[in-house]
Structures are given as structure tokens and as C-alpha cells.
Amino acid sequence: MGVLTDVQVALVKSSFEEFNANIPKNTHRFFTLVLEIAPGAKDLFSFLKGSSEVPQNNPDLQAHAGKVFKLTYEAAIQLQVNGAVASDATLKSLGSVHVSKGVVDAHFPVVKEAILKTIKEVVGDKWSEELNTAWTIAYDELAIIIKKEMKDAA
């Protein structure tokens, strides 16, 4: 179980705010990275099916990527406050949806890599090993809960 320090949570918060400052650009970049890392993942997303490239200014894409980053940010807060990420109705639902869409454990490292690369690009020279560690711990702890909910939903 990962616990985040006040400094790490502050780093996640400030970088999350920077990410949110340009949702169209940053969500597009996130999905571009996902498909560069795992081209086969394209068919998991309705808003990417039948498209030769990641669409610009797609509200569904922006909402999906925004939710991934928001849930990871919220996981960081929970780790600071409670020392753990707690499951809730949203994560239970996500587990079920992920199962129905064909998401498997191997997809989680792809998303993590794309998150980290996106945040690194967003913050530029403010990127640090501590920021990397904070986002990694938050995402890993969130992924553990989502995978558990996927197993329960299967």
C-alpha cells in the first residue's frame, strides 16, 4: 500500500491543475500516447473505432481521459488522508464497464505509461523523480482497486 506525503500530493495537485489548463491538447496527447504504446487498444474505445488517428476536440475522448486523470488525482488525495484508496460506486461501475469492454490487466501499465509521459510533457522542466513517484503510486493504488472490481464483476 502506498502512502503519499504532503509534498507529493501537492506535486500531483499542481500538475493536475496544469493538465486541466489545456484539456483539449492534453487529453489528445494522452490518447495519442496510449495508441503509440499499444495500437491494439484503439478498439476498446468507441470514440476511436474506425478512425485512422486520434480525433481532435472529441468530447467523449476528453471526458474519458479527464476522468482517468481525475481518478488518479483523487487516489493521491485518498492516500494522503486515509493511507489507502477506497472503492466506491464509481470504481465498482468502472470495474464492470472495463470487463464488458474487454480490458485486461496488461492494459493498466499502458495507461500508466501514457499518464506519466503526458504529465511529464505538461509540466516540462518541473518534472522530477518525486513527481513521477507520486503519480505512479496514486495510479498503481487506483489500478489495484479497479482490477479487484473487475474480478468481482467477471
UniProtKB/Swiss-Prot annotation:
Heme b binds at residues 46, 67, 98, 101. GO terms for cellular component: cytosol; nucleus. It is found in: Cytoplasm, Cytosol; Nucleus. SUPFAM superfamilies: Globin-like. The modification Phosphoserine is found at residue 46. InterPro entries: Globin, Globin-like_sf, Globin/Proto, Leghaemoglobin-like, Leghaemoglobin_Fe_BS. Nitrated in effective nodules and particularly in hypoxic conditions; this mechanism may play a protective role in the symbiosis by buffering toxic peroxynitrite NO(2)(-). Nitration level decrease during nodule senescence. Phosphorylation at Ser-46 disrupts the molecular environment of its porphyrin ring oxygen binding pocket, thus leading to a reduced oxygen consumption and to the delivery of oxygen O(2) to symbiosomes. Its main location: cytoplasm. Disulfide bonds: none annotated. The modification Nitrated tyrosine is found at residue 139. GO terms for biological process: nodulation. Monomer. Belongs to the plant globin family. Leghemoglobin that reversibly binds oxygen O(2) through a pentacoordinated heme iron. In root nodules, facilitates the diffusion of oxygen to the bacteroids while preventing the bacterial nitrogenase from being inactivated by buffering dioxygen, nitric oxide and carbon monoxide, and promoting the formation of reactive oxygen species (ROS, e.g. H(2)O(2)). This role is essential for symbiotic nitrogen fixation (SNF). This is Leghemoglobin-1. The gene is Lb1.
